[in-house]
């Protein structure tokens, strides 16, 4: 109904994640709850669309080594024990997440913490409402690039405001919990050799 009405609205009326009506805001809240708070399986958010293909191909080759991540069923089909975040037009409209690029992870982090008046702190809202923490982890998987203009460095500096100790923890462990009371993590793959 709202989608149809938005098409009929005059052009000067904006329709995006920051200009939602009451029903749309409730639906935005529901989407966050369903996919990022009460998620049935861990969710992996990647920088690009092709990252998912590479991860799936690698896991299919190594499924015997990682039974906690992937298994082969009786019909020979692979069953993943996690899900990938799928960028859709719905996420673009309700959260402002583009269909490709690392901005999705920055935006999802902002909706976890509530970075300003226009972006609600959904994590604390649902923790207070439900009395429990996130069901399963949400993993922001960044490429391990620490150069100044790369997405990981920008995210840690501009959004997380990571301390020197936090950056050292991420470099040493290849993962870091972003919010103490959450299951939101940033993860990077290991570097090969002396590569940066």
Describe each PLM feature range.
Residues 1-196:
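Acidic, divalent-metal-binding catalytic cores of TOPRIM
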